Amino acid sequence: HYGIIIIMCCLLNACQPASQNPRIYDSGISQELAELRKQEINELKYDLRLSIPKQKSMPVEGEIHVRFRLNKAQEVILDFREEADKIKEVSANGLPTSYEFRNEHIILPKNTTQKGENDIYIRFTAGNQSLNRNDEFLYTLLVPDRARTVFPCFEQPNLKASFTLQLDIPSEWVAV
């Protein structure tokens, strides 16, 4: 009987779902994570709002709605290359939710998503790594793999998205 139990345990461990692949949780975006997201996520839209203070020593605050369709309810992994304390609030489909922040990823559990349309809202403090801030202006060149240093997103080129950006800036500034 012990032999049967051992064999069953081995079989169960061999049948782990793709989300149990530890490489998808590595820093950066592993090939496994990129392939998993490409298969499961579509109709991706970002609605990003950034509040940029005049003083460059003050943080840039932001909020983002990440909207997408899933082929099935599952764990969702967003990229954010910042410290965990920069994440202020997370909700999924209109409800406050728990999440894990690990290795530059915001990990939302399966029970927070649904097959079909999903809306993830995150309030955060933007990272400064890719923001070039001067006394009179701010600009950024978000070359590949740098968007996640400013705001949470799915940072991979094969996931195309529509994008809206709203800027709250000092009245004497002009956004171009």
Question: What are these language model-derived features?
Answer:
Residues 2-11:
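Sec-dependent N-terminal signal peptides
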Residues 8, 15-61, 134-136, 155-157:
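N-terminal, polar/Ser/Thr-rich
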Residues 81-138:
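A surface-exposed beta-strand-loop module
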Residues 63-84, 155, 163-170:
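Surface-exposed beta-strand/loop patches in extracellular or lumenal glycoproteins
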Residues 49-51, 66, 96-97, 107-112, ...:
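Beta-strand-rich interaction surfaces with strong enrichment in secreted/lumenal proteins
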Residues 55, 71, 101, 113-115, ...:
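Surface-exposed coil/turn segments at beta-strand junctions on protein surfaces, enriched
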Residues 123-176:
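Extended, low-hydrophobicity, Ser/Thr/Pro/Gly-biased non-transmembrane segments
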Residues 43-47, 59-65, 73-75, 105, ...:
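Intrinsic-disorder/low-complexity, polar/charged segments enriched in Ser/Thr/Lys/Arg/Asp/Glu/Gln
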